Amino acid sequence: MNFFSNNFGTPCNVEFELDNCQNRKTIEVTQDKGKTEKLFVFIGNEPVSGKVSINIKEKTKKIEHTGIRVEFVGQIELFYDRGNHYEFTSLVRELAPAGELTENKTFSYDFSNVEKQYESYNGTNVRLRYFVRLTIGRSFASNIVKEYDIWVINFVKPPESNSNIKMEVGIEDCLHIEFEYNKSKYHLKDVIIGKIYFLLVRIKIKYMEIALIKRESTGSGPNVFNESETLTKFEIMDGAPVRGESIPVRLFLSVFDLTPTYRSVHNKFSVKYFLNLALVDEDDKKYFKQQEITLWRRGVTKPGLPGSTNNNNNNNTSNTNNTNTPQQKVTESQNEVPEPENNSSDESD
């Protein structure tokens, strides 16, 4: 059992306890100002239940209240719109009617059928979080409020169709290349395999590189904010190619902290991933082509994680990049997050 407490500078301390958390996986979340905390991982529609204890600091004093309630909340915060939080899930349980607390009290709570349709996400301009909130209402003083976060991931089934990506691009009478990737949809521990084939080369190429780019879009309409991050970039060719030359591409996704692709989450934000192929000529002129790929979360059976299956269910979690941008990051501690082992690029376990 795990206890989390907070000293409010108020007449009581509040402690949360989750049921069945002894073997539950955790994820380490880095919040603002470098503060990190470990959150328990919940999958899909797993129930969220436990106990909350209210401990009075001074036994000789009582706490008058207008009612005690506990809520389970799913919330989206847009950092450019601070102060406005968008709740997409909210369930309330009344724990006690108006009265007095004269001694320590422990209440049980159970949110058995709560839908957690989206994954938790900490991004550059947006955060999606799930939390349990206790509120002790008071008439002549501010309410006592304590929130306790959990981390949610969702598994999805493998895509029914997953065709390869093949496209011919270039500059008329100067450069024509054909690039091909083995799939258009990849699970988070997959391997991207492809090749670049030169059909026509009449300019002097110095080198070619490929990059994996994450693009976070927040807002809607004219108020859309796009934030792009280069997760990795490396050179795949050095020197001038000749007609008929083929350059192999191999990119292991398991070494990066990725989320699945998110599309229009509650009409508030999206997260997409792109492969960016760039060629640079001897005049340092850059030619590039960007191709979107879809990422999804694959599920596996692992002991000690309630709710995990081997039915290849999957959908998205942590967000980190290998650049030093000042943002909220999620890092996966070793052996802590339920993800497939990196021993195959196949989509089935």
Curated annotation (Swiss-Prot):
<keyword id="KW-0653">Protein transport</keyword>
<dbReference type="GO" id="GO:0005829">
    <property type="term" value="C:cytosol"/>
</dbReference>
<comment type="subunit">
    <text>Component of a retromer subcomplex consisting of vps29, vps26 and vps35.</text>
</comment>
<protein>
    <recommendedName>
        <fullName>Vacuolar protein sorting-associated protein 26</fullName>
    </recommendedName>
</protein>
<comment type="similarity">
    <text>Belongs to the VPS26 family.</text>
</comment>
<dbReference type="GO" id="GO:0140220">
    <property type="term" value="C:pathogen-containing vacuole"/>
</dbReference>
<keyword id="KW-0472">Membrane</keyword>
<dbReference type="InterPro" id="IPR028934">
    <property type="entry name" value="Vps26-related"/>
</dbReference>
<comment type="function">
    <text>Plays a role in vesicular protein sorting. Component of the membrane-associated retromer complex which is essential in endosome-to-Golgi retrograde transport. The vps29-vps26-vps35 subcomplex may be involved in cargo selection.</text>
</comment>
<dbReference type="GO" id="GO:0045053">
    <property type="term" value="P:protein retention in Golgi apparatus"/>
</dbReference>
<keyword id="KW-0813">Transport</keyword>
<dbReference type="InterPro" id="IPR014752">
    <property type="entry name" value="Arrestin-like_C"/>
</dbReference>
<dbReference type="GO" id="GO:0042147">
    <property type="term" value="P:retrograde transport, endosome to Golgi"/>
</dbReference>
<dbReference type="GO" id="GO:0030904">
    <property type="term" value="C:retromer complex"/>
</dbReference>
<dbReference type="GO" id="GO:0005768">
    <property type="term" value="C:endosome"/>
</dbReference>
<dbReference type="Pfam" id="PF03643">
    <property type="entry name" value="Vps26"/>
</dbReference>
<dbReference type="GO" id="GO:0006886">
    <property type="term" value="P:intracellular protein transport"/>
</dbReference>
<feature type="compositionally biased region" description="Low complexity">
    <location>
        <begin position="308"/>
        <end position="325"/>
    </location>
</feature>
<feature type="compositionally biased region" description="Polar residues">
    <location>
        <begin position="326"/>
        <end position="343"/>
    </location>
</feature>
<feature type="region of interest" description="Disordered">
    <location>
        <begin position="299"/>
        <end position="349"/>
    </location>
</feature>
